[in-house]
Amino acid sequence: GVNLCSTIDELVLRLQQAMENERYPPGVELPDSVQFTDSLVDALDGASGIVVAVPTRGLRSIIKACQEFHGEKTPYLITCKGFEVGSGLLPFQIIEELSPKARYAILSGPSFAKDVGERKPTMVSLASSEESSSEVFSSLLLRGDVRTYYNRDLIGVSVGGAGKNVIAIAAGISEALGFGASALA
């Protein structure tokens, strides 16, 4: 099963009641195997992997909290993109700074959470300096509609993922303004 943790009590309650995150992405029903909690200790109990799905600005505090309760033995899957404000570090560099022995993989597209939730064919990169960390999450993500590819290029995957997000936002604005396919290209 999956333990989903949030420190926002109201969000945990809404998720339990609706069995979907009405904001990220809306309309995607969560499976019954997902358990919701506001306790990081409970969420990490027995975990074979820790998926960290927070904005980059929150990554440092989440990793510190996970270390306090779980140590370095369980690998992290990092989904955030971009650079940390102030330090300019990429997400994997934040982990390496805080916990040099930590195992981790970086998840990047090209993909959108909504497509994964709607079971549309999706390919993702799992970047890690050691393939075994990527393999843990590759097996957890394995579905007929999701394909994972291992990559050792942590900087390329991290910067590429951040750049893709900027382009995706610009493309969405272009589409919303009705600029057509030429502007999108």
Q: Can you say where each PLM-predicted feature lies in the sequence?
A:
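NAD(P)+-binding Rossmann beta1-loop-alpha1 motif at the extreme N-terminus of oxidoreductases
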Residues: 1-28, 33-38, 65
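Short, charged/polar "capping" segments at the starts of alpha-helices
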Residues: 10-14, 85-87, 134
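Cofactor-binding loop segments of dinucleotide-utilizing enzymes, especially the Rossmann-like FAD-
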Residues: 7, 79-81, 129
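Internal alpha-helical scaffold of NAD(P)-dependent oxidoreductase catalytic cores
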Residues: 58, 69, 94-103, 121-185
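Rossmann-like NAD(P)(H) cofactor-binding subdomain of soluble oxidoreductases
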Residues: 30, 36-121, 137
